[in-house]
């Protein structure tokens, strides 16, 4: 094995430093855009909820043992398709932590305790609710007075972003977002 010259070592280290300084973090999670219309039409309930408590446990999904988190939420307001909705619902998301073991599912909605959000929900045959479109169906509310819809914390890169529900809703005031959503509900 040959020796490395001092000049070669310095050039190599400098190249590595420059590459790491100007590199961009790669993201492997990419999803197709859900339009606002598709999100509204595909949802069973569209509500403002606040997470009250959550519990993670193992569940058999597709013949594999996975961690899921069940979050008890309080329904603060029905925006659309909310007739007969209970005051509290159980919402299941993929991933979570049990003791020292954790499982993260990129692109999943993160229901944060005591943080109100707009949630586009599906209801499974088991009676549990699920966030439609994962993070594309979850919008944390920001601000005290006029609340605005924010971007979900674990939202991945979205293909065709300009036609997405995220583009249409993030930054909107809750009242105007609710009106846009209700206008898309078909009887």
Segments and roles (model prediction):
Residues 1-4, 15-19:
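Secretory targeting signals
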Residues 4-11, 25-27, 100-187:
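Netrin-like (NTR/C345C) domain of secreted extracellular proteins
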Residues 11-12, 26-136:
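Basic, polyanion-binding surface patches
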Residues 19-25:
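C-terminal segment of classical bacterial N-terminal signal peptides
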């Amino acid at each position: 094995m040959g020796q490395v010259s001092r000049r070669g070592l310095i050039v190599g280290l400098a190249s590595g430093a420059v590459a790491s300084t100007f590199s961009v973090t790669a993201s492997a999670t990419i999803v197709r855009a859900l339009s606002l219309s598709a999100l509204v039409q595909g949802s069973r309930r569209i509500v403002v909820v606040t997470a009250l408590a959550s519990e993670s446990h193992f569940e058999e999904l597709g013949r594999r043992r996975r961690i899921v988190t069940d979050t008890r939420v309080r329904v603060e307001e029905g925006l659309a398709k909310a007739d007969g909705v209970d005051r509290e619902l159980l919402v299941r998301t993929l991933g979570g932590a049990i003791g020292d073991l954790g499982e993260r599912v990129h692109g999943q909605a993160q229901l944060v305790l005591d943080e109100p959000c707009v949630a586009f929900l599906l209801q499974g045959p088991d009676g549990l609710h699920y966030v439609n479109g994962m993070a594309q169906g979850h919008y944390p509310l920001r601000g005290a007075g006029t609340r605005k819809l924010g971007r979900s914390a674990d939202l991945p890169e979205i293909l065709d972003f300009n036609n997405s529900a995220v583009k249409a809703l993030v930054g909107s005031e809750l009242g105007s977002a609710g009106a846009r959503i209700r206008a898309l509900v078909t009887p």
